[in-house]
Amino acid sequence: MDKGLAFDHIHLISRDPQATAEWYQQMFGGEITAVQDNLRGAPQLDVRVGGMTIVIRGQRPGEHPSATKPIHQFDGYSSHDEWGTDHFGFTYRGDLRAFCAELKRKGVRMAVEPWEFKPGLVLCYVAAPDGVSIELIQAG
């Protein structure tokens, strides 16, 4: 039942929010739409990518963020192998393998190279700053 909900944002905590926002800008064509130098003790930037807002903020006083485990390729699937958010994903309309090659030329590390998850569905995982994993799915 629709209660008037709509997806709003993903919120990331970053060691270097400015550099992380610029990474999303450079690698995925994101647009920095808001910059706050000190929001409750930390800088925060909003980046619009693929119709979605990614909120990126720094460490606040008293916080001690821990890193997530890197994504791991198991037999037939990939996972961080821990509770909570595993990754977020974008659909890519085009040749995903060629797009990944372009990202690699820009210095992006592929956590999982493009592969056929099931017939007709190619996907991969990008290693983004701060241990974040981004799934890219070839639209088909």
Could you tell me what each predicted segment is?
Residues 39-43, 117-122:
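Short acidic/glycine-enriched loop/turn segments that link adjacent beta-strands
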Residues 1-7, 13-34, 48-111, 127-140:
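Glyoxalase I/VOC metalloenzyme domain signal
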